[in-house]
């Protein structure tokens, strides 16, 4: 596993919005007395959804809410790669580069990200709209290569389709998730070859 550390530059403080604070307090009641620490992942996730990344002040705040030592919350945040430990752009592009996606051309997807976002991963684009990173399998191997933007999967990509996708996001559009090459779901690329009748 790679070494994961908090960003060098941190904000001065963190506070959940009133809505998220109420949500966090309710989330903690799902666990028996003395077991509120079980909510640590969901609270970190909610904090990341609020601010885009996990900060030291956020970890301190969550540790206080859950009556946990700071180091225990830090261990969770640095262990799970789903937590962003550095600032990210408005759109975080996560490119799958594991074997199925790589065999189907994820290198071209990475090259498009280098060209249209930043030459190195985990760097925010000059306009602040994007950052990108390579990730482990996202579970859409049948439609490889693919990437995730926000909570949506964009599949069956190549270099030009990835560039087109990023340009649409840059214009403020939200492209339709799923296959980008006109494939229907996970059917063969040329269309269904068996069981053609919909029952």
Regions found by a protein language model. Name each.
Residues 1-199:
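Signature of N-terminal electron-transfer/Fe-S-associated modules in redox systems
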């Amino acid at each position: 596993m790679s070494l994961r550390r908090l960003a060098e530059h941190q904000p001065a403080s963190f506070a959940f919005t009133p809505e998220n604070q109420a949500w966090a307090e309710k989330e903690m009641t799902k666990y028996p007395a003395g077991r509120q620490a079980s909510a640590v992942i969901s609270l970190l996730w909610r904090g990341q959804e609020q601010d885009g990344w996990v900060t030291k002040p956020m970890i301190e705040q969550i540790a206080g809410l859950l009556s946990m030592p700071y180091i225990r919350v830090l261990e969770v945040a640095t262990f799970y790669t789903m937590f962003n430990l550095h600032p990210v752009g408005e759109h975080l592009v996560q490119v799958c580069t594991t074997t199925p996606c790589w065999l189907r051309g994820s290198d071209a997807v990475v090259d498009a990200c280098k060209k249209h976002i930043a030459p190195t991963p985990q760097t925010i684009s000059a306009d602040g709209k994007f950052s990108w990173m390579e990730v482990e399998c996202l579970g859409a191997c049948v439609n490889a290569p693919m990437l995730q933007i926000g909570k949506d999967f964009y599949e069956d990509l190549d270099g030009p389709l990835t560039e087109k996708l990023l340009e649409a996001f840059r214009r403020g559009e939200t492209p339709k998730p799923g296959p980008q090459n006109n494939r229907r779901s996970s059917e063969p690329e040329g269309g269904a070859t068996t069981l053609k009748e919909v029952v």
